[in-house]
C-alpha cells in the first residue's frame, strides 16, 4: 500500500455538498484514495508534502476533446472559418492520420491538460481511416504512460459526402462495422470499477454525420454494456437548419426519439437549446459539455450556462479539439468561461467558484 500525506495545507477547496473551504488542514491518502481530512493526521507517509504555502482543489475533469487534432492546430487557412467549412477543409488532412499521429497527439494534448491541473480526460475520437490500426488502444497506452485518467470514446461516422454528410468516404464505416468494433473496444478496454483509470463511451460524431440507425443502435448497445453516450449537439445554427431540412424536427427532439436523453448521456456544446429544451435536459438529467473558447473561435455562439445551472442541468467544462481551440489548457477554459458569462449575463453569470465546481464536480458527473 502506498500512502500520501498533504501536511498543513494553507487552503483546501473541497467542492463538496456544503462547499467547504478549509484552512491549515491535512489530507491523508492510501493507494490514490483520500481516506481522511483534518488537523494533526499521522505524521508519516510514503510521501509527505508540506502544504503550508499551497491551495488544494479537486483535479479538473475535461469532458470533451479531440486529441487527434493536436497535430493540426494553429493552421492559418482555417482561422476565420465557421464549423461546416472548417470541418470539410480539415477532413482532407485528418483522413491521413495513423497510429503514430494518434500516439504523439494524445501524449501532447494530455500532457498539456496535466500541466494545467486536469487529472481526467474524455476524448471524442471519431475518425478511423482504413488500416489505421487500434487507435483507442494507442490512446489508452499514451494515457497510462502519462498517468492521467482516460475516458475514451468509440466515435463513428457513417455518412460521407456522397450521402449528404461532410467527411470523405475514406473515414466513414458501415453501421455493422462500427457496432462490431464498439463491442470489441468495450470488452477490451472498459473498466467500470471505482477509481478506474480507463473507461469507454460510445460517441457517434454528430446528427449531421451519422444515420438515425447508427444513433439508435449505439444507444441500445451502450445500455447493454452500461457505458455512456456522447455526441455533438446544438453547436451551430447550420446544424439546426440541417436537422429541420432533413428530419423535420429540432436536434434535441430528434435525439430524444432515438433514446438519446438521460443521465448516461451528455452533449458537447449545447449552444442553441430553447427554453423548453433546457427544461427537458434538466428533467432527464442529460448533461452538457461547455466549450467556450472553441465556441468563440468558430463563432458558434454562447451556451446558456447560467440558465442551465439554474434549472439543474448537469454542466461540465471542456477544451474541445485543439484545432478549434489551439490548445489543451482546461485552466484557461475555466477563466474564459467565467469572463464570457460575466460579459454575456452580468450578475446572472456563474461566480469563479461556480465555474471551478463546474470544471471539477460538474464535469465528473
Q: Language-model segments: what does each one mean?
A:
Residues 1-43, 54-55:
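N-terminal metal-binding scaffold of metallo-dependent hydrolase/deaminase domains
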Residues 8-12, 106-113, 287, 295-297, ...:
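C-terminal helical cap
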Residues 71-102, 131, 159-175, 237-262, ...:
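Active-site gating loops and adjacent loop-to-helix segments of metal-dependent hydrolytic enzymes
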Residues 73-124, 129-149, 179-195:
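Alpha-helical scaffold segments that flank or form the walls of functional sites
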Residues 131-270:
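Metal-coordinating catalytic core of metallo-dependent amide/deamination hydrolases
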Residues 147, 222-228, 260-263, 280-289, ...:
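Glycine-enriched alpha-helix->loop->beta-strand junction motifs that scaffold or abut catalytic
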Residues 257-264, 306-365:
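His/Asp/Glu-enriched, well-ordered alpha-helical/loop segment
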